[in-house]
From Swiss-Prot:
Stated name of the protein: Small ribosomal subunit protein eS10
Species per Swiss-Prot/TrEMBL record: Candida albicans (strain SC5314 / ATCC MYA-2876) (Yeast)
Main location: cytoplasm
Family indicated by similarity: Belongs to the eukaryotic ribosomal protein eS10 family.
Region listing for Disordered, in residue ranges: 91-118
Subunit annotation: Component of the small ribosomal subunit. Mature ribosomes consist of a small (40S) and a large (60S) subunit. The 40S subunit contains about 32 different proteins and 1 molecule of RNA (18S). The 60S subunit contains 45 different proteins and 3 molecules of RNA (25S, 5.8S and 5S).
Amino acid sequence: MLIPKEDRKKIHQYLFQEGVVVAKKDFNQPKHDEIDTRNLFVIKALQSLTSKGYVKTQFSWQYYYYTLTDEGVEFLRTELNIPEGILPLTRLKNAPAERPRPSRGGPRRGGYRGRARD
């Protein structure tokens, strides 16, 4: 299928930014939910990248879930002229959130284990 170059570029840029694309299986939908192009163009462009091994596809409940592979990151980086330091959001490692630590008090009084036996 012939997809206009500017639409293909929008799809590839969004895929590289996010690392994941979700598309509803509705070929007649006039516009994709997140990318400013037709839904059919998104599905077919990502289907092409899947056949080349740049994207992994999962289908569930009438939605396509496309995930970028390592080869896909390199391919899009060369195609879109993106420097080495920039990665998709799914590839960035976030610092683990600090969990609140419980207070270390003495032994608990009362309760199930603290009952005196008669």
